[in-house]
Amino acid sequence: MNLCSSGATASTTSLSSTGQAERSGGGGVAGGGGISNGGGGGGGVTGSGGGGGGNTSDGLSEATHCFGGSGGGATASGPEETINAISPANGGGASGAQQPSGSNGQLHNENNAIMPPETRPKMVTVKHPESNKPKPTTKKSKPIQADQDVIKALQRCRDEGIKRLDLSKSSITVIPSTVKDCVQITELYLYSNKIGQLPPEIGCLVNLRNLALNENSLTSLPESLQNCNQLKVLDLRHNKLAEIPPVIYRLRSLTTLYLRFNRITAVADDLRQLVNLTMLSLRENKIRELGSAIGALVNLTTLDVSHNHLEHLPEDIGNCVNLSALDLQHNELLDIPDSIGNLKSLVRLGMRYNRLTSVPATLKNCKCMDEFNVEGNGITQLPDGMLASLSGLTTITLSRNQFTSYPTGGPAQFTNVYSINLEHNRIDKIPYGIFSRAKGLTKLNMKENMLTALPLDIGTWVNMVELNLATNALQKLPDDIMNLQNLEILILSNNMLKKIPNTIGNLRRLRILDLEENRIETLPHEIGLLHELQRLILQTNQITMLPRSIGHLGNLTHLSVSENNLQFLPEEIGSLESLENLYINQNPGLEKLPFELALCQNLKYLNIDKCPLSTIPPEIQAGGPSLVLQWLKMHSPYRQM
């Protein structure tokens, strides 16, 4: 999309498909103006002089598209140009020189005499930084005139009575005043442009219902916009507004207002006038206080004030009884008002990453909530029985707080829950029977707590699919783990486990088993029964050998046994046809690799750093893992297979 003010003759801005703009100076390229920051008069292309010179800048290549100066110049086009500029000694431009004549192709003067070399015109090639190959002027593309195109689009809109006009993503900087003629428009899309301000004539669009101005550079709005008294949706996301423009408060027909990602620091009391709002987004601004006016917006169903600097919410928030989604995450909230309990239609309440130390007991009235998330606060306990009252909850996230025990309320609080996240707290035990009613529980995250043992009824968690117990102080894995036959992901890294029970082999659906950084010395033979296993992580343990049954793990793609005490790898490792990544680095006792490793046809990465492989020549090891694999293949008895 191209822009140009009506009647312009001395300057044209064109936007190419690459997004570069070419603008004219006062004179031609060869005559009146220079391309490379030229000034003065009578200069050539290189910018040693030239009146009204053009200039280049990062991301914006400028060149003339009009004639001027002492002698008109050749025009340039595209991000790379070859400009044949003729610059006689008298300072004349390209148009002042004669073209070559005669069959021999030599240049002649006005008397048809051959011109001596010292007086011949110079051929100058200009290459822009973006190009390695100059482009002849004769192949220049026709400039696109952005301004003219906008004017034409508005004319067509007026003449054909178009009601929906989309000028988005067109690099527009100015909306012409002729927009006033398109009074029939109901939808106007100007998003993703470079508009710094709107013309007052925008107020003539009295039938406008949807106005999308997001992703521009607006710092204000014209007062005339108040005449658009049928406007329902106004999108101002990603602009440069330092305040909510006062005219917005007079657009009382608004139902949806997006102000996300601006520079707004305050919300005026006049907000109370927008009583028809159902959706208000003030996300990602710099707002420190949300006044009582918010309570007047009784029709709100969605309010997003996340990613601001709020420390408190007004009690009046409780008047917004139709709210179904309230997003408060990533603020600096110290408390939540008791009036939050009035929001009985609330389904989603985002309170993540604030400075809360508690939540009000009145939240138990919000029985429509299906998710409870207070991650990243300083909460030590929840009100008694609150979670049990919220019987519709399916997801509970209490991670990164200061909990020392499970919330009070017993098994009833997890009846319909399928996901519980208590990561990064200070909980030292999981109460016996706490999940006895949680028949749908499939995901439990207890990472980074202080667990020393697992409850005796762990065998009843039969529907568990993902269990994360990493970074605790577990010393033993109960035999009853065998009952978790739906388990697909088991993460036990960074604990104090010395062995894995034989019953691990019953977890036939297991895809990921992470035992990194424990004290394990041996693995049970039954590990080979985990036929669905794709990732086995054993690094940083005390393992001296892998069981031969590991060769039965036909779906294994990732095996990490680095930082152990391996003396050898079993020959059966060659049966791992799906293996792609093998880490055996930092095993100080590993002196040789089995030739069978060469049978792993899909192996893409092999790490053997700090392994004293005495049977493989040093120059082969120095060549890297790929060369090692080639050597194994060449010396393998299976090389003909």
UniProtKB/Swiss-Prot annotation:
InterPro entries linked: Leu-rich_rpt (IPR001611), Leu-rich_rpt_typical-subtyp (IPR003591), LRR_dom_sf (IPR032675), LRR_domain-containing (IPR050216), LRR_R13L4/SHOC2-like (IPR055414)
SMART domains per UniProt: LRR_BAC, LRR_SD22, LRR_TYP
SUPFAM superfamilies reported in the protein's UniProt record: L domain-like
Comp. bias regions, Low complexity: 1-19, 96-106
Region ranges (Disordered): 1-146
Family listed: Belongs to the SHOC2 family.
Role according to the record: Acts as a Ras effector and participates in MAPK pathway activation. Probably acts as a regulatory subunit of protein phosphatase that specifically dephosphorylates Raf kinase and stimulate Raf activity at specialized signaling complexes upon Ras activation.
Protein name as annotated: Leucine-rich repeat protein soc-2 homolog
Organism, scientific name: Drosophila ananassae (Fruit fly)
Gene: Sur-8
